């Protein structure tokens, strides 16, 4: 189905329309990388007074599963194990925060909505006004609050975004061809953010085992069997 859509778009608008898709992939991945390394690191340092390097080292397995599965829900067991056994977050915190985080706190999805909507506008030569930008921001925010943690959900939300600002829905066919690649990046951000929130809450509630968090040997013994 996606192949047929891409073939139709190429025949109608030419191959030159597909080349900028590489820029979209680069923009989404760069945005996700800056968000994780910049925003998440800053939150750990400023709000929790914790070393972000330990955090990133401890969640690498959850990020790997998120990247390959493109599903926050499928990554949930690994996220729980990383948060509890590698970061020292209390099970009482992870049991509440991470399952909820699988459907909300979708920062990567919000970033994806903004970048792809702007790409579609440029690809079809549509000029956006201030109101349109505000609409995109609003929908992206709503997308980050509540989205199913399954692959491809962001693409369905993109249809809503394009419709809201009057952009042609043919743009969905363009994005569909690379959506899986983009989904891998945004899911990694979503999962990383969920674990981060559990650490911040545990830290504020004094439910964080600092001995485990700062353990230099973390990751050497990989056992994801949940207690």
Task: Specify the residue positions occupied by each region the protein language model found.
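Hydrophobic transmembrane alpha-helical segments of multi-pass transport and channel proteins
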Residues: 29-33, 66-71, 103-111, 141-153, ...
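Membrane-interfacial loop-to-helix junctions in multi-pass transporters
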Residues: 30-32, 45-55, 87-94, 125-135, ...
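Hydrophobic alpha-helical transmembrane segments of membrane transport and translocation systems
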Residues: 154-220
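Interfacial helix-loop-helix linkers and transmembrane-helix boundary segments
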Residues: 10-23, 44-56
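Entry/N-cap segments of selected transmembrane alpha helices
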Residues: 14-40
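Hydrophobic transmembrane alpha-helices of secondary-active transporters
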Residues: 1-13, 116, 120
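Helix-loop-helix junctions within the multi-pass membrane cores of secondary transporters/permeases
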Residues: 61-144, 198, 210-222
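Alpha-helical membrane-inserting segments
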Residues: 7, 30, 34-46, 120, ...
